[in-house]
Curated annotation (Swiss-Prot):
<keyword id="KW-0996">Nickel insertion</keyword>
<dbReference type="InterPro" id="IPR004400">
    <property type="entry name" value="UreG"/>
</dbReference>
<dbReference type="InterPro" id="IPR027417">
    <property type="entry name" value="P-loop_NTPase"/>
</dbReference>
<keyword id="KW-0963">Cytoplasm</keyword>
<protein>
    <recommendedName>
        <fullName>Urease accessory protein UreG</fullName>
    </recommendedName>
</protein>
<comment type="function">
    <text>Facilitates the functional incorporation of the urease nickel metallocenter. This process requires GTP hydrolysis, probably effectuated by UreG.</text>
</comment>
<dbReference type="GO" id="GO:0043419">
    <property type="term" value="P:urea catabolic process"/>
</dbReference>
<dbReference type="GO" id="GO:0016151">
    <property type="term" value="F:nickel cation binding"/>
</dbReference>
<keyword id="KW-0342">GTP-binding</keyword>
<dbReference type="InterPro" id="IPR003495">
    <property type="entry name" value="CobW/HypB/UreG_nucleotide-bd"/>
</dbReference>
<dbReference type="GO" id="GO:0005737">
    <property type="term" value="C:cytoplasm"/>
</dbReference>
<feature type="binding site">
    <location>
        <begin position="14"/>
        <end position="21"/>
    </location>
    <ligand>
        <name>GTP</name>
    </ligand>
</feature>
<dbReference type="Pfam" id="PF02492">
    <property type="entry name" value="cobW"/>
</dbReference>
<keyword id="KW-0143">Chaperone</keyword>
<dbReference type="GO" id="GO:0003924">
    <property type="term" value="F:GTPase activity"/>
</dbReference>
<dbReference type="GO" id="GO:0005525">
    <property type="term" value="F:GTP binding"/>
</dbReference>
<keyword id="KW-0547">Nucleotide-binding</keyword>
Length: 205
């Protein structure tokens, strides 16, 4: 009897404009030569993120599936994750050797979380342009995600945000939970996220 190993499912959430899709593009391009990947994106009325990732060449088009949630995007990743679970299952059946599936949420507030049925690991993305106060506002995305990404560090001087203050507040809110600054334009911080996914997700084990 062959036991089919299920792919690791990593949920990527965060507010609109924080850089979720840019992070996914960077992760896919950096990890696709090592691991068998696929992506599920969520948008309310369109499949815009699916299109962006496909046109960017993040993965082959058939490995990127867009889900139109048709309503509150939080519901589709938490209370009723059936559409996303179906997309994950379809990708797993289509590509029998999948090792990692990213599930991108459709733009969240700070209280959004992924259903444990849908995501084995969760990454939450915020950005410096939202203001240095964001980490101290808390919410499950800030405090409970498995890895917190603070993106767009290059914008700090332009928006009057102190990275030192953000670091202090993040450490206070998250304790020992891992997190990192990123500038996806330059690739700063990307390898830390990849290492986290590979180690905590026990890829290849």
């Amino acid at each position: 009897m062959n036991i089919i190993k299920q792919p690791l499912r990593v949920g990527v959430g965060g507010p609109v404009g924080s850089g979720k899709t840019a992070l996914l593009e960077a992760l896919c391009k950096s990890m696709r030569d090592t691991w068998q990947l696929a992506v599920v994106t969520n948008d309310i009325y369109t499949r815009e993120d699916q299109r962006i990732l496909t046109e960017a060449g993040a993965l082959e088009a058939e490995r990127i599936v867009g889900v139109e949630t048709g309503g509150c995007p939080h519901t589709a990743i938490r209370e009723d994750a059936s559409m996303n679970l179906a997309a994950v299952e379809a990708l797993s059946e289509k590509f029998g050797n999948l090792e990692l599936i990213f599930v991108e949420s459709g733009g969240d507030n700070l209280s959004a979380t992924f259903s444990p049925e849908l995501a084995d690991l969760t990454i939450y993305v915020i950005d410096v342009a939202e203001g240095e106060k964001i980490p101290r506002k808390g919410g499950p995305g800030i405090t409970k995600s498995d890895f917190l990404v603070i993106n767009k560090t290059d914008l700090a001087p332009y928006v009057g945000a102190s990275l030192e203050v953000m670091e202090r507040d993040t450490l206070r809110m998250r304790g020992e939970r891992p997190w990192g600054f990123t500038n996806l334009k330059s690739g700063e911080g990307l390898q830390n996220i990849i290492a986290f996914i590979e180690e905590q997700g026990m890829l290849g084990k």
